[in-house]
């Protein structure tokens, strides 16, 4: 696997965006480029995922430009690191919007970042699409300029709960979550379904970030005698929390999001602490032609859903622009989003397939590497299967897939 440093990733910006597709641009494209920005977390808590997300976008744009671009115009990429930090994300978004004049920003990760840059995008009519889960991302009057490929927290909470209630030995469940924009809405959805199924929520605790120890929180949770701890945090805090839970002698089960329980988590927590921890996230469409093309183009060491979602985000944005009449703007993207991503229409798995049919005046339905990308009226995806994994001998292994 070829890896890129943060410096190398950030150098893949304005000039690189053109160079990547240079042969196609020189031979088939003479019009002004369409500027699109990425705002991935190359550093910070999401730094495990941002580089692969960015590589995915670059790979798709290479293909778009080799196929002749969008209405004969090449796509030019501009990359910024949001640092998994809202303030840094706003500064980066302002640069993309004001200096680079992008029509879309793709692949934001943390909900706090997406929520911070959302008003800027709505005000300037720049289309924003990311993988953030907080319900607030698509709430309010965003005028259609915001969408996501990651399930919202209500859908996530319900899918986690569906798995939990299938395990009859988990009768007593404690909810333990980092203070984030999604913690409360996820917990409400999760706890409600678990209770309705007859299990007991023994405690519901939201904890602060960046504490050197969570012994007091662990003591409180374990005093309720749970069979399962639903741990909803990011990787850094989850490492500290899992260590403290292990040291306290907890013999029950832990379930967490896969974006927290990743290779860095296993390395940081250690194999003994990590062993047996369950984790879940959206399942890619493993058998899809789009997923197969994605895996060949973006080799990586994990199966997290964010890189394939980034692949789909740039594909959908490009197809929405192709469905327009030549104008490239955030408004064209939001007006054509569902026309290219939702049924009815011929199922397509790539920009080249879709652009060809659109050019023939036909309807299309993009199915991507991450699965179906069917959006409701507020920009949420309608449904998604979830992969259930468990850490076994130092690696997260797929156990089953839970369907809606």
Task: Give the positions of each predicted feature.
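Extracytosolic ligand-binding ectodomains
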Residues: 2-12, 16, 21-22, 27-404
């Amino acid at each position: 696997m070829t890896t890129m440093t943060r410096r190398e990733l950030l150098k893949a910006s304005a000039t690189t965006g053109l160079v990547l597709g240079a042969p196609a641009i020189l031979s088939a494209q003479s019009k002004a480029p369409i500027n699109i920005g990425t705002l991935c977390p190359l550093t910070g808590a999401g730094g495990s995922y941002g580089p692969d997300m960015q590589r995915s976008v670059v790979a798709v744009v290479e293909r778009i430009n080799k196929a002749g671009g969008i209405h004969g115009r090449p796509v030019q990429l501009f990359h910024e690191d949001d640092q998994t930090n809202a303030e840094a994300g706003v500064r980066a978004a302002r640069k993309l919007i004001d200096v680079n004049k992008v029509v879309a920003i793709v692949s934001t990760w943390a909900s706090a970042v997406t929520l911070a840059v959302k008003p800027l995008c709505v005000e300037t009519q720049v289309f924003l699409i990311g993988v953030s889960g907080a319900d607030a991302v698509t709430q309010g009057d965003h005028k259609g300029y915001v969408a996501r490929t990651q399930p919202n927290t209500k859908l996530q909470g319900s899918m986690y709960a569906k798995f939990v209630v299938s395990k009859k030995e988990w009768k007593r469940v404690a909810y333990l979550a980092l203070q984030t924009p999604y913690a409360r809405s996820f917990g409400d959805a999760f706890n409600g379904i678990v209770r309705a199924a007859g299990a007991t929520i023994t405690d519901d605790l939201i904890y602060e970030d960046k504490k050197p120890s969570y012994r007091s929180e662990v003591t409180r949770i374990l005093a309720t005698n749970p069979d399962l701890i639903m741990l909803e945090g990011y990787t850094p805090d989850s490492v500290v929390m899992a260590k403290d839970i292990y040291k306290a002698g907890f013999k029950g089960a832990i379930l967490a999001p896969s974006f927290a329980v990743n290779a860095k988590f296993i390395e940081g927590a250690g194999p003994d602490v990590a062993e047996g921890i369950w984790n879940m996230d959206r399942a890619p469409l493993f058998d899809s032609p789009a997923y197969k093309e994605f895996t060949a183009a973006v080799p990586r060491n994990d199966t997290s859903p964010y890189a394939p979602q980034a692949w789909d985000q740039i594909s959908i944005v490009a197809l929405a622009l192709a469905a327009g009449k030549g104008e490239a703007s955030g408004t064209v993207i939001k007006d054509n989003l569902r026309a290219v991503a939702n049924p009815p229409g011929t199922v397509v798995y790539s920009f080249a397939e879709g652009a060809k049919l659109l050019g023939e005046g036909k309807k299309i339905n993009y199915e991507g590497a991450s699965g179906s990308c069917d959006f409701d009226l507020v920009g949420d995806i309608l449904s998604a299967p979830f992969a259930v994994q468990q850490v076994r001998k130092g690696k997260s292994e797929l156990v089953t897939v839970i369907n809606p």
